[in-house]
Amino acid sequence: MRFTLSWLMQYLDTDASLDFIISKLSDIGLEVDSVDCKKHLQSFVVVEVIDVVPHHAADKLKVCQVYDGVQTFQVVCGASNVKVGMKSVLAYVGSVIPKNQTVIKVAKLRGVDSYGMLCSRDELGIAENDSTDEGIIELSDNTYNVGESFFSCDPVIELNITPNRGDCLGVYGIARDLAAAGVGKLKSVNFCDITFDNTCYISPIEICLEVQGIVKGVYIKGIRNCETPKWLKEYLFSCGVKSISCVVDIINYIMLSFNRPLHIYDADKIAGKLVFRKIDDQIEFFALNDKKYLLGKENIIAVDLANRIHSIVGVIGSEYSKCLFDTENIFLECAWFDPVDIALSSRKIKLSTDSSYRLERFVDPEFLQDGLKLATKMILEYCGGSPSSIVSVQNYVHNDILLNFSPDSVRNIGSVSITRDEIFDFLCNIGCVVKNHDCDIWIVIPPSWRSDLKHSFDLVEEVLRLYGYDKILENPIPISNIEFPDNLHNKLRSVLLSQGMTEVVTWSFTNLEFAKKFGYDSDIMLIDNPINNNMNLMRPSVLLNLLQVISENQAYGNNDAAIFEIGQIYNINSVCGDNNYVVSGVRYGDNLPRNFYKTDRSVDIFDVKSDFFKVLQEMNIGYDSVDLVRSTKSYLHPMKSADVYFNNILIGYFGELHPSIVHLYEIKRPIVCFEVFLYKIPVVDLTRKEFVELRYQSVKRDFAFLVSKNVNIQCLIEVAKKTNVQLIEDVSIFDIYEGNGIDKGMLSVALSVTFRSVDHTLNDQEIKDASDLIISAISKGFNGILRSC
């Protein structure tokens, strides 16, 4: 939002300096992007041409003498319209031309020195769209004085207005906010005094509304679309708006002053009635910016009885009925439509205009009549004409919002020392109506132009904003003595990173067809409006997304990967607030990069088994606390996978992926994976166990048993441990063998057992007795036979 200081002063009565106003704007949340004092434009002055002679060496050049009120300058000019007595604009030596940033220097043109340049409208950046002027700019005698700066030196302020403050997209709204913050007083604009004596006829153009909104209009006949007044051109130029014609410039001025977009139609091009409706089917539209747009069902249009489209409502008008210099009869429209409808319409054709930018951020629906009357008054003043009575149609009613507001909440939330009277004044200054202000709870009605004030805490924010954020007292946050345990997820991340894995974060969506291959065809949560067809299901398992990551990495030549993700999974029974978190990991390729010291190998089930139990170990769940059962999941290898149970609850699985799944993702090597269902694991004590010093030496003994291939080896380990829990510290398998020397259907399973006592050194007899118990238990429980060396 750009405006000049003098424009602001039209509505704000204050003696405050420019620096103070800029500082206050930032303090109240209206961020100042820039302030341009236009020093670079002060070198363009109004001059009078006092002599013109032909150039002695060039037919198309003329040597001119121009007077700036102080001295005379010689300028070589090629314009065909230069003549003695005319007023034009001289760019002094050192000036920078606005159009192309050319720096003017002393030049010698065909042997004649030139001290400056006489400028055209185009070079000055003020060429009008319909202008046919050629050559240098010619100024009227009574508007400009010789020697004065052509451009106004009025400082231009540019603000970055946030989307919720559409009311400040007009200079009047900015002045109102400054006045509310104590910077001067807001000057009153009495729109009720605007009346027209010659509204004795009814508009020949009717309006019909088939969408939610309000439309008002007035027909003005017999206008003269003359040149725009100098002051208005300067205001528009300062805002970066090109002057088009007097009528168009007036409605742009109303929009920039009061945040009230309007639209003008050439009334002679409209067949009887304007109908505001949505489009039934796609249609091409030729806009007044000389571009074609393909309109769809999102667009609201204004169409006449001849089915000609005259505008995309709130966005842009048509080329056919735009207002030109020779237009005599106009229809002036002032409308309000649902901001969402305008936003959708604008985005459909990928066009944002000054009008749509404001309408989609909400404009005051109560200001239509006054805005229309003000625009009509200015058009009659500068262009003449005879207006009709105002025609109006609406199917939207703006209802006031009543907010229960406690003034004490400002002090409690904002930690400020502010009186009830000050709070009352601030609310009234921004346009609120305050009732019951003698009670503890006030009834506050926000003004119609503040769509962002919807809750009582919005009012608290408004008071604090105007009172000054710098006045909020420092209030140190109280320090609690409660010690919180480290976040479990962060702990698990550290563990898996130490395992050489890399964390990834993927979408919560996945592909339905792939999920079905994993057996997820029921209790799944489909997405009604997916981002694309490959993300049409809330993921029932993180594994699906990790496999997609592996597949994409392989396509880029990354043939070794170990990745994990901690995230949520979803099913049809999931509700808001569920925390169905899992830890999922995948390994692919070789376990180590190729190196000089070790021979790499392909990853296998034991790599992910280690990852799985590292996660459980971090949750203080030991290996001996869980049960391993051969997995029946269709997407896992039937002989190289296991489901893990804790207290008879399935808490996860690990293993090698089934070859058919590997083929589905077009992955070239076997993949091993794991998934821990964190949400199924009961709350456990995450505190670290105290360190226990081991004072006495351990003893290791190895045993090799012949057992049936059908024996659950996990059970074998557990039985061995239970024979003497006081002395047996650990039992692990270090070899499994079948083949030569072993009967068919049998396995040789080698156990390594560690013995240790916490209070003495073990003697040989104790070790022998404990070993005999192990041999006896395995012999009785599994028909195991101890192998001799």
UniProtKB/Swiss-Prot annotation:
Membrane listed as a keyword: no
EC number: 6.1.1.20
Keywords per UniProt: Aminoacyl-tRNA synthetase, ATP-binding, Cytoplasm, Ligase, Magnesium, Metal-binding, Nucleotide-binding, Protein biosynthesis, RNA-binding, tRNA-binding
Compartment(s): Cytoplasm
Every tRNA-binding domain range: 38-151
Co-factor(s): Mg(2+)
Binding site for Mg(2+): 452, 458, 461-462
GO biological process, one term: phenylalanyl-tRNA aminoacylation
Sequence intervals crossing the membrane: none
Keyword Metal-binding applies: yes
Catalytic activity entry: tRNA(Phe) + L-phenylalanine + ATP = L-phenylalanyl-tRNA(Phe) + AMP + diphosphate + H(+)
Cellular component GO terms held in the UniProt record: phenylalanine-tRNA ligase complex
Domain (FDX-ACB): residue spans on this chain: 694-787
Gene3D superfamilies: 3.30.56.10, Bira Bifunctional Protein, Domain 2 (3.30.930.10), Ferrodoxin-fold anticodon-binding domain (3.30.70.380), Nucleic acid-binding proteins (2.40.50.140), Phenylalanyl-trna Synthetase, Chain B, domain 3 (3.50.40.10)
Domain B5: residue ranges: 398-474
Any Pfam family the entry gives: FDX-ACB
Cofactor binding note: Binds 2 magnesium ions per tetramer.
Predominant subcellular localization, coarse grouping: cytoplasm
Self-association state and partner proteins as the record states: Tetramer of two alpha and two beta subunits.
Family statement: Belongs to the phenylalanyl-tRNA synthetase beta subunit family. Type 1 subfamily.
The protein's name: Phenylalanine--tRNA ligase beta subunit
Taxonomic source organism: Ehrlichia ruminantium (strain Welgevonden)
Source lineage: Bacteria, Pseudomonadati, Pseudomonadota, Alphaproteobacteria, Rickettsiales
